[in-house]
Amino acid sequence: MAVAEIKKEKGSSLSPEPSSPIQILSTEPDANTDIKQEKFTPKDILPGCKVHVSKDGEFRLAEILQEHIKKGRKVFYVHYQDFNKRLDEWIELDRIDFTRSLILPEIKADTKENKSKKKSKSKGQTKLSKNNTTANSTTGTPQPSDGQPIMGDDEMDLENLNVQGLKRPGEEFSREDEIKKLRTSGSMTQNHSEVARVRNLSTIILGEHIIEPWYFSPYPIELTEEDEIYICDFTLSYFGSKKQFERFRSKCSMKHPPGNEIYRDSKVSFWEIDGRKQRTWCRNLCLLSKLFLDHKTLYYDVDPFLFYIMTIKSDQGHHVVGYFSKEKESADGYNVACILTLPCYQKRGFGKLLIQFSYMLTKVERKVGSPEKPLSDLGLLSYRAYWTDTLVKLLVERNSPALFRKNNSQLEYDEAENGKDSSATPTPGPGSNASQSSILASAAASRSGLNSSPIFSNEITIEDISSITCMTTTDILHTLTTLQMLRYYKGQHIIVLTDQIMELYEKLVKKVKEKKKHELNPKLLHWTPPSFTANQLRFGW
């Protein structure tokens, strides 16, 4: 028999609250029956509180960030403690454990010490600003210092750095202030409210893939009330109902991104799209990518950017796998502004292909490049993996011609033998010291997207590595230091190829031989670096 647990207390009613859960028992309760008592009600839940929420079969402590009424149901947006922000989600009441204690937010009272620190800090900042003003107005006159270092334009105050981008108590930011905080390139988020906003879409259906978004994206507000959003994987148009989507697809004839196909091999294709010429498509792409990138902003339009889209082909057409964008004119020498592999295609090597292609374009431009900072956590991992593979392969094979000849394909050897790469590497004439290995190295370097004519030697400079790989010296030094390859020995710097480095090289070669790692072929690239006039680079032209 099922009964409801009823306790008669002073001032309490025998009738339960309509919104309160009632425990159901299969037998009559007795003294030994363990009855779970509710310690709070839904009315007690406020933003900032912490509750235990059912997640993947167990209860996890989560912080309530926001509450909302969606289609007549009360839902809460929660952040799981000690978990990545991309796991934040909307939950309903049935996933909350009301038998465990509700943890209220801590209220930090301003003590006398805190108040005195704030006052002294504000005085120091005022004094510093006065010194800066005087220094700027008077040239050649030294000014007294208060002992605090004055930071340059490229330095960060690590003590006061707001890492999460959340608005601190007492801080107010207008839209104009937020725009002023943006970098001049327009692709980084430094505004506070953008990062702090909660995820607004529950599920998107992209072609045949059902994807759960990670972050907020400014889609139309009417779509946020829908449980599922349908996105066309060719036009990237979005719809709130399946009927609208199917009607659109029955009339849509687009089968690939609206740009020029500049690369195609047996696995992937790349398309170049000008943001000014295809504004709608590129804006839809930015809205989609913002669902999976937390550190980007959409304040600026797409006109100043070129988009390079990677696709795979099926019977239906070319499906977007990922993309990267780059500024038409980058004052800082960045070759990538934003890069993303869609979650349904991640962990399949496509991220490294995007990175390799960006450096392939940089090589054609005869430049060195680096991605715009800061990178996302997944983006940083992908770049570190690419930089590691590139440097390990280059340094090991440069130091050992035997390994180079052993681990490069017979096709490259035949091309070098037959002179098919004579346009890139002139054939040595009589009396030349160039060996057959040098010709082979040139062919393989051209195929891998590196500069031609590598020399087999146990000496190399950082600038040489930069010219071969098109990586910046900063990225090279960062990677060598991370791998613990760069040492200081007897008054000079050396690069040490340890056993761990050789193991990395063998794993890399094994992946290529087993065709687990796809390599792009620069010979299949048909692309000329675009040039723009001053008027074309002007925003809003």
From Swiss-Prot:
Assigned keywords, A-Z: Acetylation, Activator, Chromatin regulator, Chromosome, DNA damage, DNA repair, Nucleus, Transcription, Transcription regulation, Transferase
Keyword NADP included in the entry's annotation: no
Catalytic activity, as annotated: L-lysyl-[histone] + acetyl-CoA = N(6)-acetyl-L-lysyl-[histone] + CoA + H(+); L-lysyl-[protein] + acetyl-CoA = N(6)-acetyl-L-lysyl-[protein] + CoA + H(+); 2-hydroxyisobutanoyl-CoA + L-lysyl-[protein] = N(6)-(2-hydroxyisobutanoyl)-L-lysyl-[protein] + CoA + H(+); (2E)-butenoyl-CoA + L-lysyl-[protein] = N(6)-(2E)-butenoyl-L-lysyl-[protein] + CoA + H(+)
Domain called Tudor-knot: residue spans: 47-97
Basic residues biased stretches: 115-124
GO molecular function: chromatin binding; histone acetyltransferase activity; histone crotonyltransferase activity; histone H4K12 acetyltransferase activity; histone H4K16 acetyltransferase activity; histone H4K5 acetyltransferase activity; peptide 2-hydroxyisobutyryltransferase activity; transcription coregulator activity
Residues noted as binding acetyl-CoA in the record, renumbered to the chain: 337-341, 346-352, 376
Record GO cellular component, one term: piccolo histone acetyltransferase complex
Positions where N6-acetyllysine occurs in the chain: 296
Motif ESA1-RPD3 motif: chain residues: 279-300
C2HC MYST-type zinc finger locations on the chain: 229-254
One Pfam family this sequence matches: MOZ_SAS
Disulphide-bonded residues: none
Region (Disordered): 1-31, 111-154, 413-438
Gene3D superfamilies xrefs: 2.30.30.140, 3.40.630.30, N-acetyl transferase-like, Winged helix-like DNA-binding domain superfamily/Winged helix DNA-binding domain
Annotated PANTHER family: HISTONE ACETYLTRANSFERASE (PTHR10615), HISTONE ACETYLTRANSFERASE ESA1 (PTHR10615:SF218)
Function noted in UniProt: Catalytic component of the NuA4 histone acetyltransferase (HAT) complex which is involved in epigenetic transcriptional activation of selected genes principally by acetylation of nucleosomal histones H4, H3, H2B, H2A and H2A variant H2A.Z. Acetylates histone H4 to form H4K5ac, H4K8ac, H4K12ac and H4K16ac, histone H3 to form H3K14ac, and histone H2A to form H2AK4ac and H2AK7ac. The NuA4 complex is involved in the DNA damage response and is required for chromosome segregation. The NuA4 complex plays a direct role in repair of DNA double-strand breaks (DSBs) through homologous recombination.
Protein name: Histone acetyltransferase ESA1
Organism: Candida albicans (strain SC5314 / ATCC MYA-2876) (Yeast)
Gene of this entry: ESA1
